[in-house]
């Protein structure tokens, strides 16, 4: 089974990206940190997720890099012009310097916005973990996005969310040859048809109100568990990069 970047359908026409598998529609604006990314690559449009971590920085996956990126904050229905929405262009995309597009190691990227987002009930940053904070197997977390409901399914207009259980490292070590426990998180119960999928790339894995992971990759059949970039392993890089710019 080939690995499936949770943006691969993203890197085909945007209409092929869809929504969360086995989840439900989120309460509008209950996740004010969520960002919808419209990406341009070779003249075509693709999509990813992301999340606001500072008034002018969004965190996402490095494999969501494109020639230009537009960020929509404060959205629930991405096809409507909701009064809460703020559309901001990206001034600078900064993928991790050791990102490997073959193994997806260090799949993390900061996006500096061209202007500061205006804080509101629908737009506010999410907390990042403490440096020594670690998620443990059995912990319940959640992921949200405008990604895919299933293989070859249409895209979601409204934000979807799903609860996921953190799995043991052994689950993903056995499932993915390039899984790295120090910098990645394994999440999604293999007995349940619930997970993030194509189009959800770059969105946050949220545990107890804290962004602990970033949607990275999984299998192309939509089965679980999937792999998430472990944010706590990159805190010094995140802080150093935001200070630099």
Curated annotation (Swiss-Prot):
The active site is at 63 (charge relay system), 107 (charge relay system), 201 (charge relay system). SMART domains: Tryp_SPc. Its main location: secreted. Keywords: Disulfide bond, Hydrolase, Protease, Secreted, Serine protease, Signal, Zymogen. GO terms for cellular component: cytoplasm; extracellular region; intracellular membrane-bounded organelle. Its EC number is 3.4.21.-. The keyword Disulfide bond applies. Residues 20-243 form the Peptidase S1 domain. Belongs to the peptidase S1 family. Granzyme subfamily. This is Mast cell protease 1A.
């Amino acid at each position: 089974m080939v690995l499936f970047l949770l943006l691969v359908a993203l890197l085909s026409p945007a209409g092929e990206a869809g929504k969360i598998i086995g989840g439900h529609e989120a309460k509008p604006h209950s996740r004010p940190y969520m960002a919808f990314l419209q990406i341009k690559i070779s003249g075509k449009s693709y999509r990813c997720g992301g999340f606001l971590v500072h008034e002018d920085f969004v965190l996402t996956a490095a494999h969501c890099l494109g020639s230009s990126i537009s960020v929509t904050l404060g959205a629930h229905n991405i096809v409507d012009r909701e009064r809460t929405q703020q559309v901001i262009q990206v001034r600078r995309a900064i993928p991790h310097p050791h990102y490997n597009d073959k193994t997806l190691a260090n799949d993390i990227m900061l996006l500096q916005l061209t202007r500061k987002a205006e804080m509101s009930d629908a737009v506010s940053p999410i907390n990042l973990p403490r440096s020594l904070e670690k998620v443990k197997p059995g912990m319940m977390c959640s992921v949200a996005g405008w990604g895919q409901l299933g293989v070859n399914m249409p895209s979601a207009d409204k934000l979807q969310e799903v609860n996921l259980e953190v799995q043991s490292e052994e689950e993903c070590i056995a499932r993915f040859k390039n899984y790295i426990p120090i910098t990645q998180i394994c999440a999604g119960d293999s007995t349940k048809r619930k997970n993030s999928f194509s189009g959800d790339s770059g969105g946050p894995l949220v545990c107890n109100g804290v962004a602990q992971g970033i949607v990275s990759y999984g299998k192309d059949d939509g089965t679980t568990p999937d792999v998430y970039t472990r944010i706590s392993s990159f805190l010094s890089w995140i802080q150093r990069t935001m200070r630099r710019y």
